[in-house]
């Protein structure tokens, strides 16, 4: 995805929308450090959502300077948020939204990146539990004057996590 974005083959970035959600706050144990604001500093946004935010910043090369958010403790009643809704804008005008959730019920990792001549969709996440589904990259190439809402797309599936091999 980074290579495609940096190549400018699909044009400039228009927006990004990411969802990183899981079904609980790691455990139902009220004494878990992740559910204690004093120990963790925050809830699902700092625990999981920060990884989506880092990915958005990495792929776009942008820092977000305008940030609006709503955090909520909609279900778990812990000392930290179980949902965070974040709307961001960079100095160059890139608008991005992020939803980090511990009430997703079905684990989800999805990042949609809209560019001038297409979109990229990163889906799934290779984890030990396999609960986030297959890791995929969908490339959509669009010509709005001809596609009539049905652009060409191709999806690649990734079966091996080499991220630890690439760590410094």
Model regions and ranges:
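Predominantly a Rossmann-like dinucleotide-binding segment in NAD(P)-dependent oxidoreductases
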Residues: 1-77
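Membrane-targeting and insertion segments and their boundary/processing signals
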Residues: 23-30, 83, 142-146
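NAD(P)-dinucleotide binding in Rossmann-like oxidoreductases
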Residues: 76-81, 91-167
């Amino acid at each position: 995805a980074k290579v495609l974005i940096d190549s400018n083959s699909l044009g400039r970035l228009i927006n990004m929308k990411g969802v990183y959600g899981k079904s609980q706050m790691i455990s139902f144990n009220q004494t878990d450090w992740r559910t204690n604001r004093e120990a963790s500093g925050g809830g699902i946004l700092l625990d999981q959502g920060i990884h989506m935010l880092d990915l958005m910043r990495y792929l776009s090369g942008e820092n977000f300077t305008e940030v609006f958010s709503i955090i909520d403790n909609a279900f778990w009643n812990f000392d930290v948020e179980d949902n965070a809704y974040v709307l961001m804008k960079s100095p160059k005008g890139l608008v991005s939204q992020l939803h980090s959730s511990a009430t997703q019920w079905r684990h989800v990792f999805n990042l949609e990146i809209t560019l001038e001549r297409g979109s990229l969709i990163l889906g799934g996440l290779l984890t030990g539990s396999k609960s986030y589904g297959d890791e995929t990259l969908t490339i959509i190439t669009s010509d709005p004057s001809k596609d009539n809402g049905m652009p060409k797309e191709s999806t690649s599936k990734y079966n091996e996590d080499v991220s630890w091999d690439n760590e410094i």
